[in-house]
Amino acid sequence: MPTVHVIGLGRSGIAAARLLKRQGWQVEVSDRRQTPALQSQQQLLQAEGIPVQLNYDFDLQTLISVGLRVPDEIVISPGVPWHSPALVAARQAGIPVRGEVAIAWQTLAHLPWVCITGTNGKTTTTALTAAIFQAAGYNAPACGNIGNSICEVALTARALDWVIAEISSYQLESSPPLQPEFALWTTLTPDHLERHGTLDAYVATKAHLMNGAKHVILNGDDPYLRQHMVNRWPQAWWISTQGAIALPKGIAQGIYIAEDQVWFQDQPLLPTHILQMPGRHNQQNFLLAVATAHLAGIPAETIAKGVAGFAGVPHRLERIRQWREVEWINDSKATNYDAAEIGLRSVTGPVILIAGGQAKKGDDRPWLNLIQEKAAWVLLIGEAAPQFAQRLEAIGFTNYEIMETLDRAVAAAAELVTQYPIKTVLFSPGCASFDQYQNFEERGDHFRQLCLEL
């Protein structure tokens, strides 16, 4: 029986382990962490015949030196860097290393896939696309880097019609060449450079997905994609929220907004007022989803039904409540400066902004300029708080406080809204969550809980 070692006991690693076990592999799992939650998962998997090691860093040389069996294959979760020394050594030793998306693709390649990637906008576009396909009667779950992993979907007994998958750069770097029916690219700004090293490497990872797709759909409003990708895939479809004239020059295949209508190849398709979510960025997500559905043969009236019933996704400009006549908004999904800028631009000022976490590389200047324009106060949390305080001081913004934790920040915001004419309290961190939380969802859930307790 072939053996496989799965590294990472997150949702994707657990699902990959179970799927491989079902397919006849002898599976073992490891994770470098040890927490009560992981110990519970360890007990569940071991009851299913899958041994789990916690507080363990996989190392090939250690296995060899103590005479333990070397696995025939290694499968990694998205959080495990592709270029880590242990994985480099494994590949040099001839051991195949794959990501969990590769396991899912191997299982579900007979189905049509819609794959969505990009720096920002992936989650909303994925969820909206799935909502439209489901309105058409398809079993088409949203999965991947959103909610259920793709391997979790592969484990379900119910027959699938489509796979609607959000795929991150972390997942793509460990994936084989995929051949989806549709590949969508939402936006491109520098992100995850601490993982990929350079912008070129980050772009190449994203482009990897487009190369095998039957239909490529690109965001023509995104400056980087317009400048660098126009001739990359000659048969690609482009979208724009700013009319046909705003499509890249020489593009024959376009879907755009003009006169409050979505136009497809100069033919009106459906009105824009059916979209409930605010902001131009959400119009871009809307066009990408509509273009996909239309090209897949879904009628316009069904697309409109799916869009009209879609209110947005948790943690992305999610309205929690109105308290003291102030809107409290959860934007925990804003894990970089560009997403945080979009979030701040989308709400009504004056704003109390709660920001911070684990800082990323990137250009924070547009975000800081908007803070000067719209924020009455900034409350800083997490590892990045001292760094952000210095950046705010550098632009002459002094209405900030270092709060360290989200509990303290929400309590301070609740006090400030009684003293100033605030319209919105916005939690839009501009940072990763891993300094204080397992993921952005846990962070956003905590913010929601704190708001509802006011």
UniProtKB/Swiss-Prot annotation:
Residues bound to ATP: G118, T119, N120, G121, K122, T123, T124
Cited SUPFAM superfamilies: MurCD N-terminal domain, MurD-like peptide ligases, catalytic domain, MurD-like peptide ligases, peptide-binding domain
Catalysed reactions, semicolon-separated: UDP-N-acetyl-alpha-D-muramoyl-L-alanine + D-glutamate + ATP = UDP-N-acetyl-alpha-D-muramoyl-L-alanyl-D-glutamate + ADP + phosphate + H(+)
Pfam family, one: MurD-like_N
UniProt KW keywords: ATP-binding, Cell cycle, Cell division, Cell shape, Cell wall biogenesis/degradation, Cytoplasm, Ligase, Nucleotide-binding, Peptidoglycan synthesis
Stretches of the chain forming a coiled coil according to its record: none
EC main group: ligase
Matches recorded under Gene3D superfamilies: Mur ligase, C-terminal domain (3.90.190.20), Mur-like, catalytic domain (3.40.1190.10), NAD(P)-binding Rossmann-like Domain (3.40.50.720)
Major place of residence: cytoplasm
Entry's Gene Ontology cellular component terms: cytoplasm
Keyword Cell wall biogenesis/degradation carried by entry: yes
Keyword Heme included in the entry's annotation: no
Molecular function as annotated in GO: ATP binding; UDP-N-acetylmuramoylalanine-D-glutamate ligase activity
Annotated pathway: Cell wall biogenesis; peptidoglycan biosynthesis
Subcellular location: Cytoplasm
E.C. designation(s): 6.3.2.9
GO annotation, biological process: cell division; cell wall organization; peptidoglycan biosynthetic process; regulation of cell shape
Family: Belongs to the MurCDEF family.
Functional summary from the UniProt entry: Cell wall formation. Catalyzes the addition of glutamate to the nucleotide precursor UDP-N-acetylmuramoyl-L-alanine (UMA).
Protein name per UniProt: UDP-N-acetylmuramoylalanine--D-glutamate ligase
Organism ancestry: Bacteria, Bacillati, Cyanobacteriota, Cyanophyceae, Acaryochloridales
Name of the gene: murD
